[in-house]
Amino acid sequence: MAKIIVNNENKKSTIAPEIYGHFSEHLGRCIYEGLFVGENSDIPNVNGMRTDVVDALKEMKIPVLRWPGGCFADEYHWMDGIGPKEKRKKMINTHWGGVVEDNSFGTHEFFELCRQLGCKTYVNGNLGSGTVREMSEWVEYITFNGVSPMADLRKENGHEEPWTIDYFGVGNENWGCGGNMRPEHYADEYRRYQTYVRNYAGNQPINKICCGPNVDDYEWTKKVMATCFDHCEPRFHGQMDGLSLHYYTLPETEEDWNIKGSATKFTEDIFYQTLKRGYFMEELINRHGAIMDEYDPDKNIGLIVDEWGIWSDVEPGTNPGFLYQQNTMRDALVAGMTLNIFNKHSDRVKMACIAQLINVLQSVMLTDGDKMVKTPTYYVFHMMRHHQGAALLDSSLVGGATVGSGKNELPKVFESVSEDKDGVITVTLTNNSLESSEDVDIMLTNEGDKYSVSEARYIEGAMDAHNTFEAPEVVDEKDFTAYENTQTGVKVTLPACSVVTLRLSK
């Protein structure tokens, strides 16, 4: 029997709620049809935002939403997306399908969506094709509470009060679609552009996110950190609050992006290969984090994993540029495993945004007209929401088995444990095995307190189990009963291919 030893007297870092963040780009049917249907739609909506989607995201406790991209961000000119919708300029979405973007969802709509969701805002600026002035004026338009050209324009467009920008990305993937820049050049551009991302609110600072590496480009991290810290007072920690990291899990091949593998039809070998590639996130955090430690030992700069998840082939018959893919228990296990990894590294990882929110890549929901279905990944985020803002507890797995074989071998069980402000302990676990359940003895080292299970939920299913509009509850969150309270904690039996959440109360 595997054991999880929990030192519930050793509270470590706080798990930032933003680790459970999401990403919405003008790509495929993420914004249009997914989130936004317009005020005149027959689909129930509030100010154009789908009611069913907003309600489900609030239930999931979405903490932060990133917009407008992605690669789209570095060709997006924000002034095209304000004012009367019938007068907004159209553009070609060159990155994603070559479709016409009518800009009916712009700045006002994004902040209205976040208001309805009750979540923080992460705006990604255009460094690749935009100007310093354009970026500066966007921040002024959004946040300045006074008399100025941009504030006056915002008021003319119907919003008297300013909004709050919680996070601002100064460019996106500038090593690639955001300008194909060298790290030193981007870092110099970052230093210049971020200067004009001004804090107009005073008591509400904007957290500035610097474009970090693609996957394992450790040289990018070194050179960007070195350039940003050069001739910079230590108290400004490189003029950044976060450094982004992008990593997608490709199921079938990592050499040819044209052969990523099916989202629903795969072998057991590909299943374990996918999980092992998802597990690579741990190494990426450790190695990029070690470089960041050289410049920022106090961890003032968060590692911001603002694009992650499984990227598979699109569903047959759909636009290849729309990145619409199904979502199975394989996705759920990668999500649960990855979120547990983020929790364990919450001293450095301060935000993460799975790609993407709806109808694109590893989304939490899919829509078709007025129909909406929750994916297995949705339920993982819903079950693990209790970690948001809680204190990470020191925990370790002892005697755990492995699954897969050869280069695809990885731990059978992943876990993380936290305690919230009310003293409730949350334990989240994944069983990555397709063949066997796993008995786990969760032992709390503080013998003075007696805990018992107050809530237990789980999802399970075949590796390719997924929800459709015709069968929306093939994978569904249910009460978990395979546990026994003990003198030191709780013993559980994790079903094969499952994600489990336990809540322990005194």
Where are these regions (language model features)?
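Non-catalytic accessory regions flanking glycosidase/transglycosidase catalytic cores in CAZymes
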Residues: 1-242, 281-282, 286-506
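Long, well-ordered, tryptophan-enriched scaffold segments
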Residues: 216, 230, 239-258, 263-267, ...
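Beta-strand-rich domain onsets/edges
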Residues: 276-277
